[in-house]
Amino acid sequence: MSTEIGTVHRQRALELLEADSHKIRRLIEVQLANLTMPQCPLYEEVLDTQMFGLSRQIDFAVRLELIDASEGKQLLDSLEQQLSDLHDAETC
């Protein structure tokens, strides 16, 4: 794979993972606003399932060398912090 094509694939992989991260955040925002309380087992199940799925996608992209492990970790850490902030705002 040429360097130019590799760069395009890496950028696209990161964009897709960031889009998935945004979708998870929106899902949790909607769930918190309309459906459940943060202490609800359903909320925890959805959150755990979505975060696990994203972590597997990131791991796959890292193994394919489409993104660096540090980029994947930063993406997960950022989403976890955003979701923690949402949770804190709902429980206050």
Curated annotation (Swiss-Prot):
NCBIfam families: PRK13666.1
Family per record: Belongs to the UPF0358 family.
Entry protein name: UPF0358 protein Exig_1994
Species name: Exiguobacterium sibiricum (strain DSM 17290 / CCUG 55495 / CIP 109462 / JCM 13490 / 255-15)
